[in-house]
Amino acid sequence: AALWRAARADALEPAALEAAGFAPGAEAAAVLAGLAASAALRAMSAQGAQRLDRLMPPLLAAARASAAPLACLTRLARLVQAVARRSAYLALLDERPAARQRLAALFAESAFLAERVIAQPLLLDDVLDPRIDRLPLRRADIAEELKHALAALDERDPEDELERINELKASLAFRLGLAFRDGRADAPAAARRLAALAEAVVGAVLALAERELAAQHGRLPGEGSGFAVLGYGSLGGAELGFASDLDLVFVYDGARAAAASDGRRPLDGMHWYQRLAQRVVHWLTVLTRGGRLYEVDTRLRPDGSKGLLVTSLDAFAAYQRERAWTWEHQALVRARGIAGDAALHTAFEATRAEILARPRDAAAVRAEVVAMRARWRAERDRSDAALLDLKQGVGALLDIEFLLQGLLLLHAATSPALLRHTATPALVAACAEVGALDAAQAAALDAAHADLLARALTCTLDARSRVVPRDAALDALCARVTAIARACGFDFAKEGVGSRE
């Protein structure tokens, strides 16, 4: 209580703060003085100011008892300013010591999750919810919760619906972050559920965009939409991070595009699908009060950024057969339908299987996969003798991904069971089942992937770079991945390909 009274009176002594456990004391004094003098606090009602004065002493005590007192204090001060006009939150924190301790622990241990709460104070509802540790987070639960929340909206105003989608996405992603941080979900499970959340969000946004387009231009004749969203990369591989963007490709049924829409301002089919894809990208990336849903990358479509945003599935298939590079077939390994017309998803799966199961020259595949890995590493790897890039480094996540892509391209023609999978753990298991990896190699890759992914997700939650100090265990893990890749004919660490010194 004395510290907060001193802050209110502009009489803080750094030595007193340091003695209380906030070091360096001068930095802590600046944080508290800034909070006490902030415009947000000056604008508080008398009742709100009283609530804050009651809350601050126990809040300071919770910060002092946390794993990182100064960091926790700094973030809590920003949160108090963010919710100063919503004093009900201050009252709830004052009344619930357990929630206060949970908040302080979170703010001390996860810069990323703390920033989410500061940016979207509605997430305090999740922190304050005593059931938070027991709330279901399975894939089906995620989709169902989003569906019910949208169904409860009184009106279908696009902006209001988007705000609700954003709130639910933020809440569910936050809960997933808590589950990973608390050990209730391991890294692969957290990544799968983050991907499931993204799928549900893309599906909701697609429905929103389709209703908006139909209101303006009508619908195309026929069952279903004839439009599909394909997830590539981490989304397609069900390995999404807490701050990942979405790699999306859009396809449509070319036969449906021959007709025009039935509205007052009809569009021909191709332009209708083009508008639909544009609206999906817009709604996913537009900045709202709660931020944007996701960053979106559509450059994996045929002809990349020079190509049309949306193509017919027939044109997509022709491109993959006749003009795609090997690296584009590698990308297809992790591609799958995530939203839109189920019949088109099935047709896409048939196209994907046809392309990936083509017989290939083994030496050419190995050379091209290794060459592309070398190019990516030269452009993107930030490793050196002391630091490892968890994604791009030698023996790190991308080496595992490229190895599995190469193995699938080599073996899918004779082992079509490989084509059922896009996620790394499932691909590792499938490669072992068909003999592309032996049991020991598969176990080592599975363990390495889980370890590296956990480290990468932890870096995100800590708001740290995914370029981390090397240690003996990490170097041994990466060396094992490199040795397995080399044994399979993919020498990703040969001279000129390794990490920079």
Please report, for each region that a protein language model flagged, where it lies by residue.
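A nucleotide- and high-energy phosphate-metabolite-utilizing enzyme signature
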Residues: 1-498
